[in-house]
From Swiss-Prot:
Keywords: Aminoacyl-tRNA synthetase, ATP-binding, Cytoplasm, Ligase, Nucleotide-binding, Protein biosynthesis
Organism name: Paraburkholderia phymatum (strain DSM 17167 / CIP 108236 / LMG 21445 / STM815) (Burkholderia phymatum)
This protein's record includes keyword Ubl conjugation: no
The protein's name in its UniProt record: Leucine--tRNA ligase
Transmembrane segments: none
Length: 864
């Protein structure tokens, strides 16, 4: 074997062997338990980043460890290939999104292969392939048949200059990202999926998942089950008696209503604006700005009084209706009751417009003033009703029950369960996505594309220009024949939300060549035993994929109702940031590789200069690696310099998988040094390590017994840590093993071979290349088979047995040293050894022992 460890040579040789034997191709078998571990598929943005490296290495380590333990394991990979970034890149570069996407896939796949990942590439999928998105279209039509998918009007961001719909992230401070025009809200017909139909099940089934509690709580909050009262404020308009309906979780405060507010799109607002230019102008103003919920929550709250009054259902008092820009038509009834004394948003609104405030809940020991909002004003748990007539003195629950009963008796309302969750709007007015399989016929209306005509293929040669959907301008795509009547018709030009693509790709990995959406192989592998991805996907992707599983189950497509038994959300990768700020306050960020840092005598950074000019830069602190902060580390540069195994070892050792990982150049160097030591020991002891001599464990020298005891003791812990996914302590265990082996002077060749073989197997899942090559070159393969399938080492329990044990020695309860005694020593023998120990003589100060306390296996305490 080579004298020096050359990562590029070692990794090239190992990967060549794996390719030649198709080492990671997996088939279904009943002979072994299966384990399906999946990393969230990447968007093909162009290059891998360190977050990818960490995620895929975690998956790879899991795969290799479980394969050694007898599992039929599968690690697939694919590409979340549709989406807006490809359109933006296409506009910037003047190339079709398809070319940009496929070029990126090719490069990123090459990067993954250089990492030595155990991916079964025969199962690769790309969501932009017609073979894949055909099944998006097929199941959409099935959902349409069952009423799970449906069409209704929805609100979107409209850029009046570019004449296009904008995604929420394309609206910046209320303006279009390209044109700078004020964005308008526009109502257009869109397709939705009834995820709300599954709200209860989505909420209840969280209990049975092995997912982080944080993710479960985020989903619980997003689903948002609320218990409240739905009721109406009566009014008369155009000679008709009507109700302005609202939903509230604080029906106890109904006697404190001083106004009602409706959304700009509410039918009542539309009616009241007739003949009222001032109201119409305000409604038009409300329709500017983004529709994202976060934008709505943070924007300035504005309103306009309509001069129209509804009737309070219990007091018969008149309540004025306002139009409010903060009221969403898509939430609840599109109207809210205003109780400024006990709702912080309402409080701020009335302070601005001079609307009265009426306190109806009092908290003992708290005073009430309209000068400023206090947290106690919204306290429902400790409040008692006042100024509420017959409800005075009631607490929250009692008050809600009584008020709901009275509203029901009047025929004006009742208790209701509502959800924060809204149906999933899947229509996107964009080009690069799955075409929605609908044909618009002037005679027949909206006609589903027949199953035999699927897929509706997306043309891949179009280049977006930012002025509307290219599909709407493509005659070849747009023009078609109605499948019902044969008349000339037009295709739907909206495409599906890319979350549709990512809701089920793990089914297709199992059966990538199936002539149906899934087959028996899908039920063999699914649900995933382990899913790995970032916490940022906790709500949308993970919730939609759970919904998808339940729908597919109910449609008889699959047998499972949850996509993943267990979820690991890996921590972010962090790095130092450096910048300079110009006079206008604009920051220019510099990559850490281009900066020299000075440290104080305690190793703390105290200054930094840019290598290019030697001038100072500001230390910006440690933040998530990102393009915006220019603090990323290119994995390819790292692999080219140190090798994939070093990159893998560092990312596994630096932090537990679920915690943040702070990048460290010194840590990378340390990982590289450790692998050189592992190689150097194998090279220096090649002759001894290749001998297959048996040994009698009972006749070993003390140093050999000590070495075996330490190796198997550490192995026990490493095995436990692998099972807990605590790979950082697995690496620590391997380091202890190497230290012990290097320090075992005089150990026989047979014992060195045994213990070094254990080390290689413990390290293999983390650093597969170097261990695979050492295993082959030192002859272990002939004895145990390829390291890919070598059995996980078993702990030799006899090696852990000790003829002597060490007990803590205490004098008057204080630790003064340790004594070594025979494992089966009697109490009398232990006392004798303790009393004869030099530490007893020193700390007893010549006083005789009054009592000796022996705690078997732990300590001996001499009382003087």
């Amino acid at each position: 074997m080579h004298e020096k460890y050359v990562p590029s040579d070692v990794e090239s040789a190992a990967q060549g062997q794996w390719r030649a034997t198709d080492a990671y191709k997996t088939t279904e078998t009943a002979d072994k338990p299966k384990f399906y571990c999946v990393s969230m598929l990447p968007y093909p943005s162009g290059k891998l980043h360190m977050g990818h490296v960490r995620n895929y290495t975690i998956n790879d380590v899991m795969y290799r460890y479980l394969r050694m333990n007898g599992y039929n394991t599968l690690m697939p990979m694919g590409w979340d290939a549709f989406g807006m970034p490809a359109e933006n890149a296409a506009m910037a570069n003047g190339v079709p999104p398809a070319k940009w996407t496929y070029d990126n896939i090719a490069y990123m796949k090459k990067q993954m292969q250089s990492m030595g990942l155990a991916i079964d590439w025969s199962r690769e999928v790309a969501t932009c392939s017609p073979d894949y998105y055909k099944w998006n279209q097929w199941i959409f039509l099935k959902m349409l048949e069952k009423g799970i998918a449906y069409k209704k009007t929805g609100t979107v961001n409209w850029d009046p200059v570019d004449q296009t719909v904008l995604a929420n992230e394309q609206v910046i401070d209320g303006r279009g990202w390209r044109s700078g025009a004020l964005v308008e809200k526009r109502e257009i017909p869109m397709y939705y999926m009834r995820i709300t139909q599954y709200a209860d099940e989505l909420l209840n089934d969280l209990d049975g998942l092995g997912w982080p509690e944080r993710v479960k709580v985020m989903q619980q909050n997003w689903i948002g089950k609320s218990f409240g009262v739905n009721f109406g404020f009566p009014y008369e308009l155009d000679g008709e008696q009507k109700l302005l309906r609202v939903f509230t979780t604080r029906a106890d405060t109904i006697m404190g209503v001083t106004f009602c507010a409706v959304a700009a799109e509410h039918p009542l607002a539309t009616r009241l604006a007739q003949g009222r230019p001032d109201l119409q102008s305000f409604i038009d103003e409300c329709k500017h700005g983004g529709v994202a919920e976060a934008d709505m929550a943070t924007m300035e709250k504005k309103g306009m009084a309509t001069g129209f009054f509804v009737t309070h259902p219990l007091t018969q008092e008149k309540v004025e209706v306002w139009i409010g820009n903060y009221v969403l038509m898509s939430y609840g009834e599109g109207a809210v009751m205003g109780v400024p004394a006990h709702d912080e948003r309402d409080f701020a609104f009335v302070k601005k417009y001079g609307i009265p405030v009426k306190q109806v809940v009092a908290v003992e020991g708290e005073t009430f003033s309209t000068d400023a909002w206090q947290e106690s004003y919204g306290d429902k748990e400790n409040g008692v009703l006042i100024n509420s007539g017959k409800y005075d003195g009631l607490k929250y629950g009692e008050a809600v029950d009584a008020i709901a009963a009275d509203l029901k008796a009047l025929g004006l309302g009742e208790k209701q369960v509502t959800w924060r969750l809204r149906d999933w709007g899947i229509s996107r007015q964009r080009y690069w996505g799955t075409p929605i399989p609908i044909i618009h016929c002037p005679s027949c209306g909206d006609v589903p594309v027949p199953e035999k005509d699927l897929p509706v293929v997306l043309p891949e040669d179009l280049v977006p220009d930012g002025t509307g959907n290219p599909l709407a301008k493509s005659e070849a795509f747009l023009n078609c024949t109605c499948p019902t009547c044969g008349a000339a018709a037009k295709r739907e030009t909206d495409t599906m939300d890319t979350f549709v693509d990512s809701s089920w790709y793990f089914y297709r990995y199992a059966a990538p060549d199936a002539k149906t959406m899934v087959d028996a192989r899908t039920d063999y592998w699914m649900p995933m035993d382990q899913y790995i991805g970032g916490i940022e996907h906790a709500i949308l992707h993970l919730l939609y994929s759970r919904f998808w599983a339940k729908v597919c189950r109910d449609l008889g497509i699959v047998k499972f109702g949850e996509p993943a038994k267990n979820l690991l959300t890996q921590g972010m990768v962090l790095n130092e940031t450096y910048y300079r700020e110009n006079d206008a306050g604009k920051k220019t960020w510099y990559n850490p590789a281009d900066v020299t840092v000075t440290h104080d005598d305690k190793g703390r950074p105290v200054g930094a200069t840019l290598n290019a000019d030697g001038q100072p830069v500001v230390l910006g602190g440690v933040e998530k690696m990102s393009k915006s902060k220019n603090n990323g580390v290119d994995p390819q540069v790292l692999i080219d310099q140190y090798g994939a195994d070093t990159a893998r070892l560092f990312t596994m050792f630096a932090a537990p998988p679920e915690q943040q990982l702070e990048w460290s150049g010194a840590g990378v160097e340390g990982a590289s040094r450790f692998l050189r030591r592992v190689w150097a020991f194998g090279q220096a002891n090649e002759t001894a390590l290749t001998e297959r001599a048996p040994f009698d464990a009972a006749k070993l020298a003390d140093t050999e017994k000590t070495l075996r005891r330490e190796i198997y003791s550490v192995l026990k812990q490493a095995d436990f840590d692998y099972q807990r996914l605590q790979y950082n302590t697995v690496v620590s265990a391997a380091m202890k093993m190497l230290n012990a082996i290097e320090g075992a002077k005089g150990a026989s060749a047979a014992v060195l071979r045994e213990t070094y073989g254990v080390l290689l197997r413990v390290l293999y899942p983390v650093v597969p290349h170097v261990t695979f090559q050492l295993w082959r070159e030192l002859g272990y393969e002939g004895e145990f088979g390829s390291l890919l399938d070598a059995p996980w080492p078993k702990v030799d329990e006899k090696a852990l047995e000790q003829s002597e044990i060490e007990l803590v020695l205490q004098v008057n309860g204080k630790v003064r040293g340790a004594v070594t005694v025979a494992k089966d020593a009697s109490r009398e023998a232990i006392e004798a050894v303790a009393l004869a120990h030099e530490m007893f003589a020193k700390f007893s100060e010549g006083k005789p022992a009054k009592k000796v306390i022996v705690v078997p296996g732990r300590l001996v305490n001499v009382v003087v």
